Swiss-Prot record:
Residues binding [CaMn4O5] cluster: 170, 189, 332-333, 342, 344
Misc remark: Cyanobacteria usually contain more than 2 copies of the psbA gene. 2 of the reaction center chlorophylls (ChlD1 and ChlD2) are entirely coordinated by water.
Amino acids binding a quinone: 215, 264-265
GO MF entry, a single one: oxidoreductase activity, acting on diphenols and related substances as donors, oxygen as acceptor
PROSITE patterns (alphabetical): REACTION_CENTER (PS00244)
Protein name: Photosystem II protein D1 1
InterPro entries xref list: D1/D2 (IPR055266), Photo_II_D1/D2_sf (IPR036854), Photo_RC_L/M (IPR000484), Photo_RC_L/M_CS (IPR055265), PSII_D1 (IPR005867)
Length: 360
């Protein structure tokens, strides 16, 4: 009899736990995805902060030339970063227990792998948690679909690109100037600015900013007056009110006359779908572009494409970009290569056909 009571009691504890996990009455929804999301994001955050402040230099290129990224080694908020794991590690999984000592793990950039793996798992669980909460509340599932765009971008630069390039040392450093360095080197090696998918991403981000500003300013300019001149317009809205807080007909009429009639949405649902879809689709394409360039399917190359009747090159903007790319490429990892690939792979140009005679 006692055993039966204990089993029922433990079952009740589990049921109460399940109810609490999936309850939408909690101040912050946990959910089953949250059970994995919370510890992974906490681990990534704690490790990132410690490494950003105090990690020793990392041998990122695998040539015994450590690069310092932490604050106590002389960096500031702008120049500091969690430096990617060593090229000597490559794509090997490098947890703490795989290193001979903690010093070796730090020297080879182990914290970078710890942060990005926990971060990506946590972000994927955050997407799942968005779907889970939407499901519990009876909402449509498009919030997590929109979030998939930044998640795809993070996965592209932290996981897909290193896999394609053969080493986590090619992943994006976790810092401000490290991000810029990653972008510059990416342009040098892959000509990303000439890739159509990156162009779509630029259109998505800048267009999304423009449409967001247009929508916000139109709504703010066509609010239904509910207050006096000496009160804030914001007091004219009560949370949960049934009435429209702005006049969509007035906004439609204004914008339709400013541009032309059919440039203005007359359906609020279509408008807000468009505002969500435009940047999301653009960022999807950029993430897809980075993921294909990871395997060296690069941007367009129009270098020396225009020649005159004598076969001489007429320089275009593409040739200027090519020269800039070569300059950026020869400057990065300058001690790791004798020649950058673009310079070493071309045909050999003879410098002198015969040795000069020295008289005297």
């Amino acid at each position: 009899m006692t055993t039966t009571l204990q089993q029922r009691s433990s079952a009740n504890v589990w049921e109460r736990f399940c109810t609490w996990i999936t309850s939408t009455e909690n101040r912050i929804y946990v959910g089953w995805f949250g059970v994995l999301m919370i510890p992974t994001l906490l681990a990534a955050t704690v490790c990132f902060i410690i490494a950003f402040v105090a990690a020793p230099p990392v041998d990122i290129d695998g040539i015994r030339e450590p690069v310092a990224g932490s604050l106590i080694y002389g960096n500031n908020i702008i120049s500091g970063a969690v430096v990617p794991s060593s090229n000597a590690i490559g794509l090997h999984f490098y947890p703490i227990w795989e290193a001979a000592s903690l010093d070796e793990w730090l020297y080879n950039g182990g914290p970078y792998q710890l942060v990005i793996f926990h971060f990506l798992i946590g972000c994927a669980c955050y997407l799942g948690r968005q779907w889970e909460l939407s499901y519990r509340l009876g909402m449509r599932p498009w919030i997590c679909v929109a979030y998939s765009a930044p998640l795809a971008s993070a996965t592209a630069v932290f996981l897909i690109y290193p896999i394609g390039q053969g080493s986590f040392s090619d992943g994006m450093p976790l810092g401000i100037s490290g991000t810029f360095n990653f972008m510059i080197v990416f342009q040098a090696e892959h000509n990303i600015l000439m890739h159509p998918f990156h162009m779509l991403g630029v259109a998505g981000v800048f267009g999304g900013s423009l449409f967001s500003a247009m929508h916000g300013s139109l709504v703010t300019s066509s609010l239904v007056r509910e207050t006096t001149e000496i009160e804030s317009q914001n007091y004219g809205y009560k949370f949960g009110q049934e009435e429209e807080t702005y006049n969509i007909v007035a906004a439609h009429g204004y914008f339709g006359r400013l541009i032309f009639q059919y440039a203005s949405f007359n359906n609020s649902r279509q408008l807000h779908f468009f505002l969500a879809a435009w940047p999301v689709i653009g960022i999807w394409f950029t993430a897809l572009g980075v993921s294909t360039m990871a395997f060296n399917l690069n941007g367009f190359n129009f270098n020396q494409s225009i020649i005159d009747s004598q076969g001489r090159v007429i320089n275009t903007w593409a040739d200027i970009i090519n020269r800039a790319n070569l300059g950026m490429e020869v400057m990065h990892e300058r001690n790791a290569h004798n020649f950058p690939l673009d310079l070493a792979a071309g045909e050999v140009a003879p410098v002198a056909l015969t040795a000069p005679a020295i008289n005297g």
